[in-house]
């Protein structure tokens, strides 16, 4: 008689575990496959943080079903250099329906994935492109090395004295 309650409890525990495994695809956090060790924000929270901190934003726009997006995810997530550089940005990860409708976020088309860089005021800087990529898809990155290069360029252009001087000239 004692085996029935144990069997029932074991079955319930096994079923609960199975549900947990099925419902979890490993991308539940804001990282969505691009690395949960990176401090990701929503676009709204990211813009607020950038305005308060003076850090530029790096925005990744991708789709859950996209093959090129899936190929970039592990390269991005496993790059120690991207992880280190991410501390100099407010990192925003937009998937599927989170993609903004604003045309500023698709300067040369709506292909995916796209990586865009915004200044601390939230303005997209379309001049920061993947220099080593396809000129028809300027914001499409296929390797961690390309992303690192874009991050370094954005950091140089959107932070420090060079950015402040350019920003001041624009206001005058």
Curated annotation (Swiss-Prot):
It catalyses: [protein]-disulfide + 2 glutathione = [protein]-dithiol + glutathione disulfide. Gene3D superfamilies: Glutaredoxin (3.40.30.10). Residues 27-156 form the Thioredoxin domain. It is found in: Endoplasmic reticulum lumen. A motif (Prevents secretion from ER) lies at residues 169-172. SUPFAM superfamilies: Thioredoxin-like (SSF52833). Optimum pH is 6.5. Widely expressed. GO terms for biological process: negative regulation of endoplasmic reticulum stress-induced intrinsic apoptotic signaling pathway. It is an enzyme of class 1 (oxidoreductase). CDD domains: ERp19 (cd02959). One of its GO terms (cellular component) is endoplasmic reticulum lumen. This is Thioredoxin domain-containing protein 12. It comes from Homo sapiens. The gene is TXNDC12.
């Amino acid at each position: 008689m004692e085996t029935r309650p144990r069997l029932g409890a074991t079955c319930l525990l096994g079923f609960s575990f199975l549900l947990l495994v099925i419902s979890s695809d490993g991308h539940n956090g804001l990282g969505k496959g691009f690395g949960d060790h990176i401090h990701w924000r929503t676009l709204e929270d990211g813009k607020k943080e950038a305005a308060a901190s003076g850090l530029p934003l790096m925005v990744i726009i991708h789709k859950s079903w996209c093959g090129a997006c899936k190929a970039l995810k592990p390269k991005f997530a496993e790059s120690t250099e991207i992880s280190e550089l991410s501390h100099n940005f407010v990192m925003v990860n937009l998937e599927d329906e989170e993609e903004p409708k604003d045309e500023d976020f698709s300067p040369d088309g709506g292909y995916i994935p796209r990586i865009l860089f915004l200044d601390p005021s939230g303005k997209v800087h379309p001049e920061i492109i993947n220099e080593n990529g396809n000129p028809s898809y300027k914001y499409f990155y296929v390797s961690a090395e390309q992303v690192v290069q874009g991050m370094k360029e954005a950091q140089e252009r959107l932070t420090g004295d060079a950015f402040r001087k350019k920003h001041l000239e624009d206001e005058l």
